[in-house]
Amino acid sequence: MAQEGKAYIHLALAIYYAGGKIDEETLKKAAEAIGMQVDEAKIKMLVASLEEVNLEEVLKQAVAAPVAAAAAAPAAAPAAEEKAEEEKKEEEEEKKEEEVDLSGLSGMFGF
């Protein structure tokens, strides 16, 4: 059922991008054209809801939102790089300590 509701929204967006008017008749024809079972109550609710919405503004905001989130991500990257470098240094120090320990043992056994 939820998928059907999304299908009506997708139809409305397709009509919008095609430059058509989003009204009950156009949505009904589009739904029939793709073989959907028409639910006139859902179509009426969607059209009523969209009358209160400026689709152009909503779509501009939706496109801009991921860009803003992506711009914030690089700021976190240096901290992650520093942490990775610290971990790498710690691992190298541990390896050196192990090598020292092993070299002592190898000296004892003539290796």
From Swiss-Prot:
Q: Assembly and partners?
A: Part of the 50S ribosomal subunit. Homodimer, it forms part of the ribosomal stalk which helps the ribosome interact with GTP-bound translation factors. Forms a heptameric uL10/P0(P1)2(P1)2(P1)2 complex, where uL10/P0 forms an elongated spine to which the P1 dimers bind in a sequential fashion.
UniProt keywords (A-Z) are: Ribonucleoprotein, Ribosomal protein
Q: Which GO terms fall under biological process for this protein?
A: translational elongation
What HAMAP family does the database record attribute to this sequence?
Ribosomal_L12_arch
The molecular function terms of the Gene Ontology recorded here are: structural constituent of ribosome
Residue spans with biased composition (Acidic residues)?
88-101
Q: Which family does it belong to?
A: Belongs to the eukaryotic ribosomal protein P1/P2 family.
Q: Please explain the role this protein plays, according to its UniProt record.
A: Forms part of the ribosomal stalk, playing a central role in the interaction of the ribosome with GTP-bound translation factors.
Question: Which Gene3D superfamilies does the record match to this protein?
Answer: 1.10.10.1410
Looking at the record, which segments are called Disordered? 75-111
A Pfam family found in this protein is Ribosomal_60s
GO CC terms for this protein?
ribonucleoprotein complex; ribosome
Q: Which residues form a coiled coil?
A: none
Q: Which InterPro entries does the record associate with it? A: P1/P2_N_sf, Ribosomal_P1/P2, Ribosomal_P1_arc
The name this protein goes by in its record:
Large ribosomal subunit protein P1
Q: Which domain of life is it from?
A: Archaea
